[in-house]
Amino acid sequence: MSEIIQDLSLEDVIGDRFGRYSKYIIQERALPDVRDGLKPVQRRILFAMYSSGNTYDKNFRKSAKTVGDVIGQYHPHGDSSVYDAMVRLSQDWKLRHVLIEMHGNNGSIDNDPPAAMRYTEAKLSQLSEELLRDINKETVSFIPNYDDTTLEPMVLPARFPNLLINGSTGISSGYATDIPPHNLAEVIQGTLKYIDQPDITINQLMKYIKGPDFPTGGIIQGIEGIKKAYETGKGKVVVRSRVDEEPLRSGRKQLIVTEIPYEVNKSSLVKKIDELRADKKVDGIVEVRDETDRTGLRIAIELKKDANSESIKNYLYKNSDLQISYNFNMVAISEGRPKLMGLREIIESYLNHQIEVVTNRTRYDLEQAEKRMHIVEGLMKALSILDEVIALIRNSKNKKDAKDNLVAEYDFTEAQAEAIVMLQLYRLTNTDIEALKKEHEELEALIKELRNILDNHEALLAVIKDELNEIKKKFKVDRLSTIEAEISEIKIDKEVMVPSEEVILSLTQHGYIKRTSTRSFNASGVTEIGLKDGDRLLKHESVNTQDTVLVFTNKGRYLFIPVHKLADIRWKELGQHISQIVPIDEDEEVVNVYNEKDFKNEAFYIMATKNGMIKKSSASQFKTTRFNKPLINMKVKDKDELINVVRLESDQLITVLTHKGMSLTYSTNELSDTGLRAAGVKSINLKDEDYVVMTEDVNDSDSIIMVTQRGAMKRIDFNVLQEAKRAQRGITLLKELKKKPHRIVAGAVVKENHTKYIVFSQHHEEYGNIDDVHLSEQYTNGSFIIDTDDFGEVESMILE
């Protein structure tokens, strides 16, 4: 044999071969036919079982035999693919109406594998026989099988709209399909209405076909998504589990899940919910149990005594497959091509198929009836001249001679002559003669009826309607899925997501932040905090994990950080730098931190800058949902910076202290509530290159402590301060020296809880008791506590 060598480019070969492969996958494997709702392997399985008599009214038969028949005659692929498809057709959590009944382990909603095919037994379900009914009446086209040894149907007669009733899912080259199951009675009713009113709208159709009806039940939300899918073939709905509350002893309760979304793995769902509980992602769940048994699906979620069951349920809806989004993608093979189809198109294609099936069946029945009529007429004629016929047959040489003589002598046809010579003697009684007359009358009526169906389109549609109504009456079942018009908004209370726990928040001057358990803090003490060289603790306080931290920076920005998102770090260890949580500029520094519980309107923040600007903003303005970037809390001009932020519950006095020892005290009610992007107003009238070193709230039980660059500390009583108006010059708190004048580098208001001070110089930290610092007069410079010649100038101070 001579070889044929073609010189082709690799690009052309690959493109051509992949195109052929894709066409095969699309048409012959992954996508269902719109007419019978079946993929080729499913159709071959059902036809093989029907052909071998493995039907509903017979006994179960080993699945392996069916798989062997399918592989041997119709589907030359691996046995596992055939058996898997066969098993799916028997799973009542996958199909709304199973097409195969199976004895033995056919898998589970937990995605457990089925038993091997040598152990399971199967037969067609009663409904699946309606897919195959009349297939032997030339209703559908047959094609040769893969080795031309037998024929297989291109499509099944499908006496009900299986594509909509059982749905389909599949992925092929460039195409995917997701068609949900529907209620049989609703689909048939919708089809009947379409037959009566071909121009029916989607809105009108949805009065009958309300939406998907999943075998696993559940609650479907989003009428608009259903409508869009029915109009265009694509749409989206939310499917959520059916969850009820059940009381337990001692006032506790549990959530009981009895229905889950379609195609959700139950065991994976239980595992996920338990992981959320174990990882403390949700607070209030004691235990998760799978209590499913032969009576039905049941997942028990036991709750703590005072748990917010509604919020826990909503959290699970959002963070587990207790609720999913189902995306319609109604692609099916129509006229040999994949097509995205709406509801009307699917029903129209099915109806056209039924018109063809009923027409072909009627032609077949008419042909058979006419053939029988011809035979009956011949028998009746023969019986009317019985003696002559008998004599002719007796005088004939053989059967063929008798037939030829009958045709020649009495004008019988070949078929009639065959029937006459095959007639048994007992059929010559009067009873059988009358039976032939009756059969003749019945055949006349049948032929008339069949011809009317073929000639009258309305009569043909009436047949389709009658047969659909018959199936509806026989197989009608109640809807399992509930449809709700709107998609529910999921609201989750913070306490459900975050276990309530008191922790210690700490922030250093260099921007290291952490939360620490009270146990670790108490075991170490404040002074044992982990710090980098040169860093100092700016603030520490007790907060709750459900609180929110607001970290303010010198650039007039704040960071919004939920406490539970802070790393849980031991007190002796270094914290996490703020820039690792929210990115900030390299030269940006933290100035203060506060925790918020509820961002209530009554509270407000006072923000003050180095160059004497101040503003007031209500706490509610700081609430946000953005955690990933700094947010503006004050517009700060160039060469200025934010030096402090004070949180107050109500209006009270604040005092401003400057570098040159000026002090101004006034009420915050002089400040209007402004937006976060405002620049503020003048706080104090600064002169001679002076700047603000402190702005804090103050009341009559407080004192003010300050330290100068020369190492002197001074403490004054509240009474020294003089309440004035905003933007004034203020009073002088230092005695001005001509040589080496004192300049304030740090100041603080001493509250009742303050007992100690720490003063930081360039090379030294000075600790002392606040009570040991005596109260001074207005025009003094205080007492020296640090020798700056030995330890360098003072830089800062904190109170504890």
UniProtKB/Swiss-Prot annotation:
Residues flagged as site, Interaction with DNA: 39, 75, 77, 88, 94
Catalytically driven reaction(s): ATP-dependent breakage, passage and rejoining of double-stranded DNA
Membrane-related topology note: Peripheral membrane protein
UniProt cross-references to Gene3D superfamilies, sorted A to Z: 3.30.1360.40, DNA gyrase/topoisomerase IV, subunit A, C-terminal, Topoisomerase II, domain 5, Topoisomerase, domain 3
GO BP annotation list: chromosome segregation; DNA topological change
InterPro entries registered for this protein in UniProt: GyrA/parC_rep, Gyrase/topoIV_suA_C, Topo_IIA-like_dom_sf, Topo_IIA_A/C_ab, Topo_IIA_A_a_sf, Topo_IIA_dom_A, TopoIV_A_Gpos, Type_II_DNA_Topoisomerases
Compartments in which it is found: Cell membrane
Annotated site residue numbers, Transition state stabilizer: 118
Protein's recorded name: DNA topoisomerase 4 subunit A
Taxonomy of the source species: Bacteria, Bacillati, Bacillota, Bacilli, Bacillales
Record gene name: parC
